[in-house]
């Protein structure tokens, strides 16, 4: 159902053309042109937001209307479909008096020439057309909307999903219950805080496993990264499902072709996952780890990652440059240094506060100390990787005015602050950091310049992008495309210096070969090591990370079975827990067959 022109290109074209791209008279042609002699009119079903769901809710619930919001629907292949359209001003339902639909044995074409608002009490101009196609065990559809105001999002409402275990990105576990479920892609759909926030998923796929273990899945077939959400609302016989697609915030289009969705009936969850990943492989040109061309030979040989914690937000120094070098000299006596990647966390001064200057810290040893660390580390054989904040900038830094136009504005215009950490422990979250968008030239160029200088000046082997998976649909630029451009621009200058990231979603693994969080099924494309907040030997310090102390497990050495072994080095690790360091190194050698 996707045109040869990519969705990203189409979005650009439509954004330039505006609502004049398609006159109202053109929209019915989508139906007329594809109607056939066996077409039959479909009944319009007078459903509402409370139809066939528990009212009031019986378990965990989210914000919902407190009245019957119209959801006129049509039936196709055992499911009932309706639509809601959202602009920055209001929520709109299809006007049942202006709806018509025709069906064939393998298609349904829906047309609506007007909307209602105020729960059906008022009317609004607008047009929606949707085309559904059935092929074997799948249903696919898309919708085109034309509204008086820029479209924020379009929701397809589906009834007919069975009750069962609900999973996202893969099969769900546990016992089904009466909770409502809201999950967003990527980065929880951009809403992180408050009582109505979504869980996160790395790819837009939801699977319901029924009591007989058969599965019904729904997935987005989009060819670009933009926010998606699934909302599952239970009733006695099944789920009312919302499949929500946000329009690209940076274009503010009144007329929008929403991305395609697919419902798939399969005998197993694995079959649903396989079908979805075949779409991802085609769309994002994903390559399995073993055949990736952006992985240097040394990265394939990494058997241990060592996180060297530098300077905390408060200025407390865990390990200065001289101490880090002393530790490296000892480590080189324990295993081949060329098999170790050194992750330099907070190498540049006060963690987050000094973002985004990215200059060596005088308090940690200055230019001389840092250069000695890198040069001697290289001579020993280690690979060195400094850390950068993909989307964090302190408004109080003098340079901030150069990049202030890149602060993220969500699709509804809400300014995003990076304000979810209490760095100074006054029991109040900080408010000085802005959340930045690599889709804006000023910020991307700044970051490329800082990373390029580090590679050129010191010859570091890789660079780490913190929160790179924190995608938000922003009004001031395409964040995913900006991230891709940053990586590709640096790759053009330094082809053997790879990017490593925190937090993954499906399209990111196309150009980032390593992460420091678990990847699940995305691990077939990229590898991962353990997060820098993982508890260090001894008291379980999280180092520069805000979480404080965890529990280090001396039996497992706190090593994750699916990750590259990772050694966390904080202030007392080398002085008090060198024996545990040696044990972790030995375990890494055993796993690698060294």
Per-region residue spans from a language model:
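Aromatic-lined carbohydrate-binding/catalytic grooves of carbohydrate-active enzymes
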Residues: 304-376, 380-448, 458
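Glycan-recognition surfaces
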Residues: 401-442, 491-594
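Carbohydrate-recognition beta-sandwich/jelly-roll modules
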Residues: 41-341, 376, 383-384
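N-terminal export signals
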Residues: 2-3, 9-31
């Amino acid at each position: 159902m996707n045109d040869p022109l990519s969705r990203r290109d189409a979005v650009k074209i439509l954004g330039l053309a505006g609502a004049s791209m398609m006159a109202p008279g053109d929209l019915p042609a989508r139906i007329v042109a594809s109607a056939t002699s066996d077409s039959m009119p479909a009944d319009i079903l007078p459903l509402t937001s409370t139809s066939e769901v528990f009212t009031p809710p019986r378990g965990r619930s989210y914000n919902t209307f407190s009245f019957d919001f119209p959801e006129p629907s049509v039936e196709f292949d055992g499911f009932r479909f309706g639509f809601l359209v959202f602009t920055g001003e209001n929520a709109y339902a299809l006007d049942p008096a202006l709806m018509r639909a025709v069906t064939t044995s393998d298609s349904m074409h829906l047309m609506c020439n007007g909307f209602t608002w105020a729960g059906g009490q008022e009317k609004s101009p607008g047009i929606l057309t949707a085309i559904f196609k059935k092929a074997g065990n799948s249903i696919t559809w898309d919708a085109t909307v034309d509204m008086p105001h820029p479209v924020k999002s379009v929701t397809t409402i589906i009834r007919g999903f069975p009750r069962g275990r609900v999973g996202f990105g893969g099969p769900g576990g546990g016992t089904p219950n009466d909770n409502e479920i809201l999950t967003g892609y990527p980065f929880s759909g951009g809403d992180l805080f408050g009582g109505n926030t979504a869980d996160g998923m790395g790819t837009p796929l939801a699977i319901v496993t029924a009591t007989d273990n058969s599965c019904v899945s729904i997935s987005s077939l989009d060819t670009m990264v933009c926010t998606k959400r699934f909302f599952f609302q239970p009733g006695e016989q099944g789920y009312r499902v919302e499949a929500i697609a946000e329009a690209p915030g940076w274009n503010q289009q009144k007329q929008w072709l929403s991305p395609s969705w697919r419902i798939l009936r399969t005998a197993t969850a694995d079959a649903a996952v396989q079908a979805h990943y075949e779409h991802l492989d085609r769309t994002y040109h994903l390559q399995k780890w073993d055949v990736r061309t952006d992985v240097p030979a040394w990265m394939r040989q990494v058997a241990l990652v060592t996180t060297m914690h530098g300077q905390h937000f408060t200025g407390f120094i865990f390990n200065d440059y001289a101490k880090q070098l002393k530790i490296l000299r000892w480590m080189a006596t324990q295993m081949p240094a060329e098999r170790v990647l050194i992750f330099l966390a907070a190498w540049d001064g006060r963690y987050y506060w000094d973002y985004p200057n990215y200059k060596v810290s005088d308090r940690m040893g200055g230019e001389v100390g840092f250069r000695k660390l890198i040069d001697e580390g290289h001579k020993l054989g280690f690979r060195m990787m400094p850390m950068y904040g993909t989307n964090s900038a302190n408004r109080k830094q003098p340079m901030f005015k150069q990049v202030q136009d890149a602060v993220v504005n969500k699709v509804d215009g809400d300014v995003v602050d990076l304000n979810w950490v209490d760095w100074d422990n006054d029991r109040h979250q900080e408010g000085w950091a802005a959340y930045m968008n690599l889709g804006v030239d000023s910020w991307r160029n700044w970051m490329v310049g800082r990373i390029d200088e580090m590679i050129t000046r010191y010859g570091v082997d890789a660079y780490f992008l913190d929160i790179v998976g924190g995608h938000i649909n922003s009004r001031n630029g395409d964040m995913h495309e900006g991230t891709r451009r940053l990586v590709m621009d640096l790759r053009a200058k330094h082809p053997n210096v790879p990017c490593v990231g925190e937090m993954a979603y499906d399209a990111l693994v196309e150009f980032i070969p390593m992460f420091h969080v678990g990847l699940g099924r995305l691990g077939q494309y990229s590898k991962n090591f353990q997060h820098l907040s993982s508890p260090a030997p001894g008291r379980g310090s999280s180092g520069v990370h805000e979480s404080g102390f965890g529990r280090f497990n001396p039996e497992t050495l706190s090593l994750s079975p699916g990750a590259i072994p990772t050694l966390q080095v904080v202030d007392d690790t080398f002085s008090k827990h060198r024996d545990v360091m040696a044990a972790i190194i030995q375990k890494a050698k055993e796993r690698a067959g060294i």
